[in-house]
């Protein structure tokens, strides 16, 4: 994407295919656009307030006028999978759509095989450009 609006558009398009039980990790350095991407997803589901990373609360819940919510995790402050399991657990994984910032860095060993991974990389020559790789383990 070339700018914030492109990123939100891509996320909005991606969100059309999400369903209950989907787990998505967003990975990239600080400032790479993870939260901007999540705001694009939120827009698709008519979440009116800006989505911000739950760095200290670990998880935010958003009702989306369906029979399930969206859970937004930021596991940056979680030490490892064991701490995540002790403090949060995996019950959320089946209850709604889970969007997990830093998931591949911190809790990759407890994520289901069907997890969708989104890697975001900054362009070194253009401060506004981002590259997105969306993939799933085989």
What are these regions (language model features)?
Residues 30:
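The conserved Walker
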